[in-house]
A protein has these predicted regions:
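Catalytic-domain carbohydrate-binding cleft regions of carbohydrate-active enzymes
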Residues: 1-177, 183
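Accessory, solvent-exposed terminal regions and/or long lumenal/extracellular loops of proteins
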Residues: 177-265
Length: 265
């Protein structure tokens, strides 16, 4: 599925999804959890029950699947402002799931070597566990062939830093862990955990910061319901992070531009 997701974005179809654990899956815990993990960093997760004989609820296979899937579903809900901002970019043609060469064009990314990894927006590098490489009986595995472009990259779950411009092999991926890296300097708009977008606190701004020199991002929002965005009803907020010569971090959230019905000022 991973090359299909990448190819869909390159073909002008950014809102791609597929059945969690396969349409007739539902018996293999490891496949189930790995699917929930990487599809957290995709536009949509389609978990449809009733087509096959097996239940497809996120908790249907018991533990540890229930807890691990819950963790990733929670994270997906928290990343909604980040995803929504890049969904706005997709209106103009730049996909949410990006082939590596879209962000980092070079001889290596122009070939097929990075077809099993991708960028989620500009800041997350996702390298799914798509096959059994060296898995033990509990499903703990490794991932080979992770290409990190030039620059510094941070393991999203541990905070460990990696220098880019190289390929990483034998990257530890215990059962709970998706190999995902965030670009140093990233500013990630987030929100409160929620079961439905109606539960999002629009008056709360959360930014996950990875200060490195001077960086900035743009957060986009609108009413999330109507097509009023086509008439310009939406808002943008510029957020800057600057590391001073004294190694102090100055964060600037600029005044939001625009308006829409229901916007919380």
């Amino acid at each position: 599925h991973i090359p299909t997701y990448i190819g869909s974005g390159l073909s002008g179809q950014p809102n791609i999804t597929s059945d969690m654990d396969g349409i007739f899956g539902g018996k293999n815990q490891i496949v189930n959890m790995r699917d929930f993990q990487w599809k957290t960093f995709t536009p949509m997760q389609l978990n449809m029950d009733g087509w096959g004989a097996n239940e497809k609820y996120p908790h249907a296979l018991g533990e540890p699947a229930a807890s691990i899937n819950r963790m990733y579903l929670k994270l997906k809900s928290e990343l909604m402002p980040y995803a929504y901002s890049f969904a706005k970019e997709a209106v103009d043609g730049m996909p949410i799931i990006r082939a590596m060469f879209l962000e980092f064009p070079n001889d290596y990314t122009m070939g097929s070597a990075t077809k099993y990894q991708y960028m989620y927006g500009t800041d997350f590098l996702v390298a799914p566990i798509y096959q059994n490489t060296k898995a033990d009986a509990e499903g703990n595995d490794i991932r080979n062939g992770i290409y990190l472009p030039e620059g510094e990259w941070i393991d999203y779950f541990t905070g460990e830093k990696y220098e880019g411009g190289r390929v990483i092999n034998n990257f530890a991926a215990p059962l709970w862990k998706l190999p995902v890296f965030v670009k140093n300097g990233a500013i990630i708009p987030m929100t409160n955990p929620n079961n439905n977008v109606s539960e999002i606190n629009k008056g709360l701004r959360i930014y996950e910061m990875y200060p490195n020199k001077h960086t900035m991002t743009v957060e986009y929002d609108d009413d999330g319901i109507t097509e009023a965005y086509k008439d310009g009803k939406g808002v943008t907020t510029f957020i800057e992070s600057n590391v001073t010569p004294k190694n102090e971090v100055l964060i600037t959230v600029h005044r939001t531009q625009g308006n829409f019905d229901g916007f919380v000022k």
